[in-house]
Curated annotation (Swiss-Prot):
Quaternary structure and interacting proteins, as annotated: Heterodimer of AddA and AddB.
Family: Belongs to the helicase family. AddB/RexB type 1 subfamily.
Binding locations of [4Fe-4S] cluster: C784, C1112, C1115, C1121
Protein's name in the database: ATP-dependent helicase/deoxyribonuclease subunit B
SUPFAM superfamilies reported in the protein's UniProt record: P-loop containing nucleoside triphosphate hydrolases (SSF52540)
Lineage: Bacteria, Bacillati, Bacillota, Bacilli, Bacillales
Organism: Staphylococcus aureus (strain NCTC 8325 / PS 47)
Length: 1158
């Protein structure tokens, strides 16, 4: 029973001395007494390789490299193990979650948190922490008895003690945790003859838990010898750099005193690891109180990058230089990090440079398609077949892998489901999924082609197969009563899905293709799933449980599954965290993310028990818990020290100025400290360095091409670019080995969104030999030719969703107003409040069920929206009544359609126009309302258009002039052409072109006293004032509002009179009859010009910018045209917005059917 302690700073040869001793003993007596090297889990593989690869040893039967848990198993093999079943991490988590749910009503502080998955995880960690530090429920109960304790702390500890005690009772005599197995190991030590003959070495640790100290105590007591290696100078000062390992030494000294043995200390002072003076000086002076500056010889570098991505790209380039120029191997290099954001960057960037690497971290299995399928399947049952988990389940492609183009079929199914609002048990309604229903998907109904029918039949078959599997699963689970029943039902369901065969086939294919890591993942997924089922049966067995609770507990278990990947090769870069990674004697170590906030890292308490509660508990209960935040904060310098002393050749520190979320970052104060130790140790700004040394960017062929692209793009924009980039382009272009993909990059370099003008034949194939179109189609072309091409040429459709769109709301208002107008023959004056409500209810009952497959009755929200629509309609009718009371114009026709060949007598005829290519233009559409007034055998007509959007309820004559707003002039033209079909007199003249804004008006008041009910109603009515353009003819003016008189401005039409009875400029929007006719004829010419441009094949990405706004803001096709202000701004079209449109139209000569030149 001897105890040795090898003490010294990093790189002084402590571990080398240990390995040399072990090697000498093994050479002297290969089959002698056992030698046990205890190391952290992360180090065991590396140390085993050291013995295996030693040419003088070639392995050993005498020496074993173990961590504490594996050592315990070694002892159990000799003396016998415990009879209890050992709980896995997942089994422990599931058991504690179930206990928390059962005990929820008894909890005092955590009752509301108990339902969340994360709470049981925190509670499990706290209980495991207690066990590591030998704190029992009895300790907690004794501590809780303290009358001076705060109520919140008392309630917290009572809750934890309740769950902890219940957990201990559940596992008593039946199960054992990993921490308890270590306690059993301690009890077994005296029985082990093997241990009594063993020489023990403990290396690689900087701190231990209470249970681990007890193990060490047992080893010292029963083993032949124990040697512990610690990185410390022996200084017990709590503010020393080596506080943490010195604390370990203090504990070992206490153990030695208890056992009445002395510690044979051996101090190591000579530095052996470092190959140069830079690293020696860095190690010796890092914690020095008085700085001794020396010249840096180039073995320490500090890199500053703009972003984290740029930082890792630079590290990758420098690794290539290490391998190529310095003749290092990948296994000679290590990367250490602390910010978890870097893990993703390693995976995304290092493969681009063909750098083999292994990250010493475990990845969760939850994002694997198989796990996502299972968790989505669980959620489908839990949520009663809601659409989101169903779609996630389908998109995993696990249950649909047997279908060709399954992803495409699932995409079509998703379109249909979102359009029809399929949820809940509607998934089971075969009638809803009739193939004929797919003919209407995202478009007007049309007859399915044979190919479309075959495709949609496959969609329906796929959906039915998946539903059958889910129903089978649901039925099997619903018949289960105990946990064992549930586990059995789940496994049998997976077999029914043929999941095992599917996974094994996929694994074999991956292995055959050399993708061994992915193949290994498949194995671990299936084994992990079976392990969770086994754990459930082990822990709960025949215990009754509801299906809901079982699925919750099962999901908790799935959350704990992690991939444990074995390195695929020995020659690879080692990547790990600064806190846990065990890398030693690497030629080059890169420490990335050296920012303030990461190194040092603010340490905050994340456990259920706060730092203050820990300290109070330790004092009162005389126990030791895990270190508090302030203690851990003191050890940050030691973490940095250990990380940077792992190298023996070079150390590169790097940091970025911007975080992963775009936040500003500062340099680590440790780097400032390191920089102060050396003269001429400058921070290298990476962008500036590359600007001066462009060749440093050319380390990898593929990545050089990408950087070359950026350089050439800068050159095209007249920026100064180094000649070496032009040389690099020529080399790559002329090399058959390197020029793959170069043409693609060059085409991207000159990409400018320029479209190809369609030929005459293709234009006719796309648009037909005649143009049959609505007014909005021509307006859409004027906004942007490409928008028209995408919608009417390519016929691209947006995914239709089961939700109310703005245009749906407009259609509802139009339909409701048409229904009511026809019922009352347009006589709004006769309406009273009772009649308004009655007609509104009738109209809504008739119309709303037809909107989007009865959408407005699908949920409480939409039913509320229906009532809101009803309220808007009632207010609108009140406004129409008010307007009708003071107008001589009478509404006569509602929702009147027009086209070239009317299908009924009620429809109007639209005159055919002709393009410059001789192609007929047939305009079709629907006029919301036509009001008429007849006097002296002359009929005057008003066009009334209902708008539910305020932005579109305005007639902008500048837009009319330029063909951007064509609707109202077209409607007036159609009405003037159809006087006989409308039953008008021989002489018909325009009255007004007016918009009616259907909306829910709001009135602002400064104070409550301003509110008057009668005035409020009047003000609301005024909010519905018509806007647009009115014929300045006195007969029209008098008929529009019979109240008009001098100094009066109408509140129903845009007309006002001055004091002398003339039309006021401020309150009137009027034009004379000839001007209106000119606008109408000019509108026709805009139709001809627009249609001619369409048939000419214009498809340019050329939006029309008007009043500093682009139509792109609300365009559905941006993802297709990739409009970009930098690329396309030169093609933005503009118009002269300063013109007076009425003066402009009066100054042009127009030939028309109204009487020659005007």
């Amino acid at each position: 029973m001897t105890l040795h302690a090898y003490l010294g700073r990093a790189g002084t040869g402590k571990s080398t001395k240990m390995l040399t001793e072990i090697k000498q003993k093994m050479k002297a007596d290969p089959l002698g007494d056992p030698i046990i090297l205890i190391a952290p889990t992360q180090s065991t593989f590396q140390l085993e390789q050291a013995f295996v690869n030693d040419p003088e040893l070639n392995g050993s039967l005498r020496t074993e490299v173990l961590h504490f848990e594996r050592l315990s198993h070694r002892i159990f093999q000799e003396v016998g193990s415990y009879s209890e079943q050992k709980l896995s991490k997942a089994a422990t988590e599931m058991m504690i979650y179930n206990i928390v749910q059962e005990q929820q009503k008894y909890l005092k502080l955590y009752q509301s948190q108990a339902k969340y998955y994360g709470f049981s995880e925190k509670l499990t960690e706290q209980i495991q922490d207690f066990k590591k530090y030998a704190v029992t429920p009895e300790h907690l109960e004794h501590f809780i008895a303290d009358k001076n304790m705060q109520t919140r702390t008392k309630n917290k500890l009572e809750d934890i003690a309740l769950i902890y005690r219940e957990f201990e009772q559940r596992i008593q005599n039946e199960f054992i945790t990993g921490e308890d197995s270590l306690q059993y190991f301690i009890d077994c030590m005296p029985k082990s003859e093997w241990l009594k003959r063993a020489d023990i070495y403990i290396d690689g640790f900087h701190n231990f838990s209470t249970i681990e100290y007890l193990i060490i105590k047992g080893l010292i007591k029963y083993a032949k010898s124990v040697t512990i290696i610690l990185t410390t100078d022996g200084n017990h000062d709590q503010f020393s750099l080596f506080r943490k390992p010195s604390e370990v030494l203090r504990h070992i000294e206490e153990i030695a005193n208890e056992l009445n043995i002395s510690i044979e200390r051996q101090y190591f002072n000579q530095l052996y690891r470092f190959n140069n003076q830079d690293l020696k000086h860095l190690e010796q002076e890092f914690d020095a109180l008085q700085i001794n500056r020396v010249a840096c010889q180039g073995h320490i570098n500090i890199l500053e990058s703009a972003t984290m991505r740029e930082e890792i790209n630079e590290i990758a380039r420098r690794i290539i230089v290490d391998i190529r120029d310095k003749q290092l191997r990948y296994q000679d290099i290590a990367i250490l990090y602390r910010d978890e954001s870097y893990a993703y960057l390693f995976d995304s960037i290092l493969p681009l440079y063909n750098i083999p690497y292994n990250i010493d971290t475990k990845r969760s299995m939850t994002h694997h398609p198989v796990m996502e399928m299972i968790r989505s399947l669980i959620e489908v049952i839990q949520s009663n077949w809601q659409v989101n988990p169903m779609l996630r389940l389908l998109k995993t492609d696990v249950l649909t892998a047997s279908y060709l183009k399954s992803a495409y079929l699932v995409d079509l199914l998703e379109n249909f489901v979102l359009e029809r609002g399929i949820y809940g048990k509607r998934w089971l309604d075969d009638e809803l999924f009739n193939v004929e229903h797919f003919s209407k998907m995202g478009r007007k109904a049309h007859k399915l082609t044979e190919d479309e029918r075959n495709t949609f039949e496959q969609v329906v078959k796929l959906k039915k197969d998946v539903i059958d599997k889910i129903l089978h699963f649901e039925k099997q689970m619903s018949q289960a009563e105990t946990v064992k029943d549930f586990a059995t039902a789940f496994y049998e369901s997976m077999e029914y899905f043929e999941l095992p065969n599917q996974l094994m086939t996929e694994r074999d294919e991956l292995d055959l293709n050399g993708n061994h890591e992915k193949a290994e993942e498949i194995d671990q997924i299936w084994n992990g799933l079976i392990q969770i089922l086994d754990d459930l049966v082990l822990v709960f067995g025949d215990e009754p449980m509801s299906m809901e609770r079982f699925l919750e507990v099962f999901d908790i278990g799935l959350e704990q599954l992690e991939f444990v990947m074995i390195p695929q090769t020995l020659d690879q870069v080692s990547i790990g965290t600064m806190d846990l990674a065990k890398v030693d004697n690497k030629q080059h170590v890169y420490l990335v993310g050296m920012n303030d906030g990461t190194m040092p890292q603010p340490v905050t308490a994340s456990s259920l028990i706060t730092d203050e509660e820990k300290k109070y508990f330790e004092q009162q209960a005389n126990v030791e818990l895990s270190p508090t935040s302030d203690i851990l904060q003191m050890d940050e310098a030691f973490v940095c020290y250990v990380a940077m002393t792992r190298a023996k050749g070079d150390v590169t520190f790097s940091y970025s100025l911007m975080g992963s979320s775009g936040d500003d970052k500062e340099i680590s104060p440790f780097l400032n400290q390191i920089q102060s130790l050396f003269n001429q140790l400058e921070i290298t700004n990476i962008p500036q360095y590359h600007e001066v040394n462009p060749l440093s960017l050319m380390q990898h062929a593929k990545q050089t091409k990408i950087t070359l692209f950026e350089a050439l793009r800068a050159w095209l924009y007249d920026e100064i670019v180094a000649d070496s980039w032009l040389d690099a382009y020529q080399v790559i272009r002329d090399s058959d080995h390197l020029n793959q993909g170069l043409d693609y990059l060059m085409s991207a370099l000159t990409f400018d969104n320029e479209t190809v003008k369609l030929g005459e034949t293709l234009s006719k194939d796309l648009y037909g030999k005649e143009i049959n179109a609505s007014v909005s189609r021509f307006e859409g072309y004027q906004q942007c030719p490409f928008k028209h091409y995408a919608s009417h040429g390519l016929k691209l459709n947006e995914r239709t969703k089961y939700e109310l769109q703005n245009f749906d709301l407009g259609d509802i208002f139009h339909s409701v107003l048409k229904y009511i107008s026809e019922r009352i023959n347009g006589d709004f004056k006769q309406l009273d409040l009772k009649k308004i409500r009655q007609l509104t209810n009738e109209a809504l009952e008739e119309i709303l069920p037809k909107v989007q497959f009865n959408l407005l009755n699908s949920s409480a929200y939409y039913r509320y929206l229906s009532r809101r629509i009803g309220a808007i309609v009632e207010t609108t009718l009140s406004a129409l009544k008010y307007q009708g009371t003071y107008s001589k114009f009478m509404p006569k026709h509602f929702e009147t359609s027009f086209r070239r060949k009317p299908r009924t007598n009620d429809e109007l005829i639209a005159q055919t126009l002709t393009t410059t290519q001789g192609i007929p233009i047939n305009i079709r559409g629907q006029i919301d309302r036509i009001d008429t007034y007849t006097k002296n055998d002359t009929s005057f007509v008003n066009i009334i258009d209902y708008k539910s959007s305020e932005g579109s309820a305005t007639l902008d004559l500048t837009k009319v002039y330029y063909g951007m707003q064509m609707q109202m002039m077209t409607y007036m033209d159609i009405v003037l052409q159809n006087k006989q079909r409308l039953g008008l007199t021989d002489i018909v003249k325009p009255g007004g072109l007016l918009y009616f804004h259907v909306h829910e008006p709001r009135i602002k008041f400064k104070s409550w006293s301003d509110i008057d009910e009668d005035k409020l109603e009047q003000d609301l009515i005024k909010k519905f004032k018509l806007s647009g353009l009115v014929n300045a003819d006195q007969t029209v003016i008098d008929a529009l509002d019979i109240r008009l008189e001098p100094k009066f401005t109408s509140d129903i039409v845009p007309v006002g009179l001055n004091k002398d009875g003339s039309l006021s400029k401020r309150g009137s929007q009027v034009a004379d009859e000839a001007t209106i006719y000119k606008f109408i004829q000019h509108n026709k010419e805009n139709f001809i010009e627009t249609a001619s441009n369409i048939m000419d094949g214009h498809t340019e990405v050329a939006p029309l910018k008007y009043k500093q706004k682009l139509p792109c803001a609300f365009c559905s096709y941006q993802s297709v045209c990739h409009v970009d202000g930098m690329i396309d701004s030169k093609r933005y079209r503009t118009v002269d917005e300063t013109i007076n449109p009425i003066e402009a139209i009066q100054n042009i000569n127009i030939n028309d059917e109204f009487g020659g030149e005007q």
